[in-house]
Amino acid sequence: MIRRIVAGLLAVSLGASAYAYEEITVTEGGTLTGTVTLQGQIPKPKGYNLTTLPDAIYCGRISDGRGWRLLQPFDVGGDGAFRQVVVLLEDIERGKAFGPYTPPRIEARDCRFVPFVNVVRDHHDVVVINMDPAMHDIQAYETSQLGPRVLFNVPLPISTRYPREAGLSAHFHKHFEGTPVTQTVKMTKGRHIFTMQCGFHAYMESWALVVDHPYFALTDERGRFQIADIPPGTYKVTIWHPYVHDSYERTVTIKPKEETTADFTVAVPTGRLYANQMVENAYVRYTVTEEVQSQIVPTLEKQTY
């Protein structure tokens, strides 16, 4: 089922490449560095009533203590350092080689897909691994203004090393690796956004920007990025995050063997950002016994916002 995480995010668009990227030897390349900062109060997280979804006890090891699981899409550090943002050179036709490809590894760990933001090369693989004693199901889509398209939908095997009671416990914190699932990402021409969600646990999301050249970076813990070996010239630089709808771009001129700086300040999105939000009544949809409520205990992480 295509969930509401796709709706409302289709305004995010990157220019479609009308050329095949050409790999060349770059000897006089320059470097682009900078930071991405989120300005304003960090939005409230998405909220999911654990009693309406499977594995409430095990997945409730990370929760707010009132039966809600939170998902904060905005990873922000001190001084507004905006982490897990992709910075990309647009429409670069030739440059350095990709180098050896290592498929992104996405783990289902503690009922989360980690990492939340990735970069994937088009027509190449991603590897997804279940580290939990709970059943997870990958539902992967490509998105654009024209709507989503299913890329693949496969279950994630559970490791046979888990004891049977592990998935029913709020106190089992060991992780064993299930059989890896490898899938090839093949995007429709002009589409660049890949999203993955668990079919059983709606709060498990992972996103990726799909690229056809190696001139990109993912911001670090301090919101910094660096892109090296850029052929001299003038380029458009853009940023991408799955929950930032406005476009941000800069024009930069790269000089031989010199460093150029481009900083981005992103305004906090306004309005209702998500379909799923926490409400004050912790068990708003169903009558839940005190026994079940008492079993949903944040023994691994008590979430706050």
Identify the meaning behind each predicted range:
Residues 7-16:
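Bacterial N-terminal signal peptides
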Residues 20-305:
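Extracytoplasmic copper-binding redox domains, predominantly the cupredoxin/blue-copper superfamily
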Residues 1-6:
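Bacterial N-terminal signal peptides that target proteins for export
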